[in-house]
Regions:
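N-terminal membrane-proximal hinge/A-helix region immediately C-terminal to the signal-anchor transmembrane segment
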Residues: 2-136, 159-164, 168, 228, ...
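Leucine-rich repeat
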Residues: 23, 240, 265, 269, ...
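Conserved, non-catalytic sequence blocks in retroelement Pol enzymes and Pol-derived host proteins
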Residues: 43-47, 61-66, 148-153, 330-337
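Structural signal for hydrophobic/aromatic residues that build the beta-strand cores
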Residues: 48, 75, 85, 94, ...
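Cytochrome P450 C-terminal heme-thiolate binding region
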Residues: 86-98, 238-250, 323-379
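Cytochrome P450 heme-thiolate monooxygenase catalytic core
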Residues: 110-119, 133, 152-300
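Cytochrome P450 catalytic-core helices
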Residues: 295-320
Length: 379
């Protein structure tokens, strides 16, 4: 009689047991690979919190809560100018290193983090990591964003919106009411109230999507209006971009208020190695909405706060602008030294969108802040 072989069906006959086995093996492999990375990583000797050797999760949670800047600042106070933030990212608060990282042509391309913001398979200026493509795109927009072009085509509209916002603030104050300056500056910087809701949803949804993509994917599947608005806001921005394409084609290239996209030089478009497609214009239009609305409102709110918090400065500033001619223009304001200084100092102290600008260490590695970092490290 042949010998009886051991029966091993206890794990194969039960689906529950098989799932448990797979989960257990997967967890063990993840744990061992994480431990191996922590022990062998070239970044292991850098200062930093213990968890930075193993996981990104504490940083991701801080970002989702809108506390990234404060969170990293607190860690700098504890660990110094250079420390390991995650298994693959190093935080640096060093002027010389910052200059090296962000100087033009320095070789530090945008980190992979930016790729998560690409819409419709078309990268815009904000999330474009290819340096040559980015430079070509900037050249296409250079004329439209030149100071003389903006003044000639848009100053009248800016003045109308500024005067309307200031008038509304004055009406509230004369009625003895408090005035929400952030609200009015946001209305001033945004064409339609609908845009504001899209901007708010985009900011929240983009943060979650970039740090916790699985949660964002699940959120899009839940048929709740708030979640749908939050996690599909980019699609709505693309819709606005579509309107920009249509209006730019209809408006032509002349006259005040012509679309930024209508001012693109056709010859430059043809000569460019990376000409703009309709999808590119839709994406850039959405980017411009995000970049120019709440940033303007936030900066003006902090400027107003800072001036009111310093009465002597307020008096000097009021005296300076009182000397402007009745029909003053932007050029006249630019010639006011104190006003210019106040604007610049506000932008220095209260950046409209403070946060990291993650870059990847170039091929061959680099020394930053006294530490050698391997290529591909996010800094």
């Amino acid at each position: 009689m042949a010998p009886t072989l051991p029966v091993v069906s206890s794990y194969t006959s039960s689906p529950t047991s098989l799932v448990t086995l797979v989960i257990g093996v997967t967890t063990l492999v993840w744990f061992l690979s994480t431990l191996h990375r922590a022990v062998t990583s070239p970044l292991r000797s850098l200062p930093g919190p213990l968890w930075s050797h193993f996981t990104h999760l504490p940083l991701k949670l801080a970002i989702v809560r809108g506390r990234r800047t404060q969170y990293i600042h607190a860690l700098h106070q504890r660990h110094g100018a250079v420390f390991r933030l995650t298994p693959t990212e190093v935080a640096i608060a060093d002027a010389a290193a910052a200059k090296q990282i962000h100087k033009p042509g320095g070789g530090y391309d945008k980190a992979a983090w930016y790729a998560q913001f690409v819409q419709g398979n078309a990268a815009g200026l904000f999330d474009m990591s290819d340096a040559k493509m980015h430079a070509a795109r900037r050249r296409l927009f250079a004329r439209a964003f030149g100071k003389s072009e903006i003044r000639g085509r848009w100053e009248w509209m800016v003045r109308e919106k500024v005067e309307l916002a200031v008038r509304r603030v004055g009406e509230e104050l004369r009625r003895g009411e408090e005035s929400d300056l952030l609200k009015w500056w946001t209305f001033m910087a945004t064409d339609k109230n609908e845009y504001i809701h899209v901007l708010e949803s985009t900011m929240i949804g983009s943060g979650i999507r970039s740090e916790l993509p699985l949660l964002a994917t699940l959120g899009r599947l839940i048929p709740h209006p708030t979640l749908q608005a939050m996690f599909n806001a980019n699609s709505r921005l693309l819709d606005y971009g579509t309107r920009a394409v249509a209006s730019s084609k209809a408006a032509g290239t002349g006259g005040q208020g012509a679309s930024i996209f209508a001012q693109l030089d056709p010859d430059e478009q043809k000569a460019s190695a990376f000409p703009l497609t309709d999808l590119d214009i839709r994406v850039e239009a959405g980017n411009f909405i995000v970049a120019g609305a709440d940033t303007t409102a936030v900066s003006l709110t902090y400027l107003t706060y800072a001036v009111l918090a310093h009465p002597p400065l307020q008096a000097q500033l009021e005296a300076e602008v009182a000397r402007l001619p009745p029909a003053f223009a932007d050029r006249d304001c630019e010639a006011c030294p104190l006003l210019t200084a106040v604007v610049n100092e506000t932008l220095r102290l209260y950046g409209a969108a403070p946060g990291s600008l993650p870059r990847a260490v170039p091929s061959g590695g680099a020394e930053l802040g006294g530490w050698w970092l391997p290529e591909g490290t996010t800094v």
